[in-house]
């Protein structure tokens, strides 16, 4: 009882201080908003999309070429750039957006997949009485609620458990989390609560039990980041923005303002990356929303511009779904080096991350083995010793570059800005940098406000609060049932389509091929263990997918869930895209090779394959080597030193096991390091050595060969005197 009174007293004191800060900050926030909107001139805002469907990429390119001048040209198709385009076009501004790669090809698709207010920022705000940190949290919590509302199919609340291993931490964390709920106010998703040790283990049975005191559960949001980014860009296109991916800005256009005599940025020279065609896109205002590449565009404007971006790499890994409960995440608030690690269920898998390492800016960040192992070690610290955390259980890994920035207008140019920065150069180039995924909308609003004021544009107020993104307006939690009933899709596929496309899922279902089976009637899967279907490839092209990498990483999320499954699906994906886009054989092969290179370097396949090669010398006991050699030779009956698909088929037929040829090719390809269609004895021994060390989670070939050996050993010859054939 005394303990509860002490805790309540702490809350009252902390809450009183926070209420004072809250009141002052809200008044200041209101004044800032009024000042921002004072200069906005009346204009006709667009209340409904002008296009039922986004125009084709070809149509968008024609609009870019044939429009004499846009009001706004946004460079960058990530979350912030797409948000700027949507904010501008819905204010009635003539808007264009160009992206040198694909929408969400950079940092925006490589996040932790959380929509959060920032618990740690609130802790700093209270401990240091930092009003800026508090405002960041307040703004993020408002934006979190808005994002969950406007894209309900792509986002949902997620309970996150904070395990406590020291008794004094329980009231400390509880007060902090309750203040997080308090700051959220009406935007609080669900109230946080405390769990006893036994209840915590019920929810998270694989948790480390020793010294566990209890746990605190709070709520944040989770989303499908690349699909969310795409939904923002597609919504902007439907409202009339000319958006084009694979359009690179080669240089900025400039002209002298006749009224002031100053040189002003007046557009950009753009190059179609797919065809090489170049043309000018003119605009009254150009916005630089290029994330980690902020400085490269600023230097196009002014070659002497000081760098403001300090890039930091954040690595994440994906592990099998059994590593976490299906509907609850875990937060490690203090890792061995002071970082925060999240451990979250996502798309029926488990995401663990992230790291925070200074890096160079690159279009192709590669996850390092050091960072992967750091995350694995932190996971081991929090999971029960009964759970063996193996390197081979890493199904995919990626690195995203955080565009941390310094404010060029600040007196202390060395300090990292914890919020976003809107900078206006002497020539009128507007740069938006920093911030985080959750606050993309408010960042876009601030940026367009600055553009309207600086360039005297005629625009209405921002309308993006509550504006549904594509697929969200008519979505409901039971929409998938109609897909099952009306089209004959299997339930898992229907749920996936509803959660990916929202009310547009019916259009995908209409494209689905007949399976030829009694059930499901339609919906041929790309790979058996994931609910992605072939119709999504056709529909993905309508969503501006231009390459196989677009399809495996951002239209579907296969590359982020399992690199091997993505590689297995690639040939069929390329075949389907080739039909729609009229690719010849050379183009198809080029797409295959590019996509495999992407999986190998950027999605962790290289690190995964190194567990079998560079770092996996054969370290088996002599008895194990003999045992595996005997198993191998049961397949290699001709003593060739290698086995082929024919050898495997022969053994399987002898034990009455049927398996189609495509599956067998996939099974052998997993182990065929030389990619010569043969699995050599040395490759097989390397595989078994890696499995024993836990560097590889398992192999279908290894399991198949073990099962075949056991079946062959059981077939002992029947003695003549027991076969009814003796005399």
Swiss-Prot record:
CDD domains: EFh (cd00051). The modification Phosphotyrosine is found at residue 601. The gene is GPD2. The lineage of its organism: Eukaryota, Metazoa, Chordata, Craniata, Vertebrata. Residues 623-658, 659-694 form the EF-hand domain. GO terms for molecular function: calcium ion binding; glycerol-3-phosphate dehydrogenase (quinone) activity. Calcium-responsive mitochondrial glycerol-3-phosphate dehydrogenase which seems to be a key component of the pancreatic beta-cell glucose-sensing device. Calcium-binding enhance the activity of the enzyme. Ca(2+) binds at residues 672, 674, 676, 678, 683. InterPro entries: DAO_C, DAO_C_sf, EF-hand-dom_pair, EF_Hand_1_Ca_BS, EF_hand_dom, FAD-dep_OxRdtase, FAD/NAD-bd_sf, G3P_DH_FAD-dep. Its EC number is 1.1.5.3. Residues 1-42 form a transit peptide. It is found in: Mitochondrion. It holds the Pfam family DAO. It catalyses: a quinone + sn-glycerol 3-phosphate = dihydroxyacetone phosphate + a quinol. This is Glycerol-3-phosphate dehydrogenase, mitochondrial. The keyword Isomerase does not apply. SUPFAM superfamilies: EF-hand, FAD-linked reductases, C-terminal domain, FAD/NAD(P)-binding domain.
